[in-house]
Amino acid sequence: MARREKREPIAYILGRKEFWSLDFEVGPGVLVPRPDTETLIEEAIRLVPDRSAPLRIADLGAGSGAILIAALKEFSHATGIGFEASPQAYDYASRNAARLIGARAEIRLAEW
């Protein structure tokens, strides 16, 4: 209760947040994925209806990796790269990518 009284996000307290039916690790140093951001994935599906298209997806400012990883889950033959300048967010994105999508996602600590 003390952490909530200090207005710490519930996702930080739990250490996780669901996004696009996937369970992402989150905490201080990374933005919590928001449900309204899922509209980006919906729009990608609308624009590219062939979910087996061999896409290469880039995510600039990857944060937790939620957008890139969700897109890769939907596009089964796609690969992607996420760039993140924050070392803390990079760590979260790297762990989430390794656990949820494997070698199809590469996360780089870099300014873009």
Stretches with model-predicted labels:
Residues 1-47:
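Conserved AdoMet
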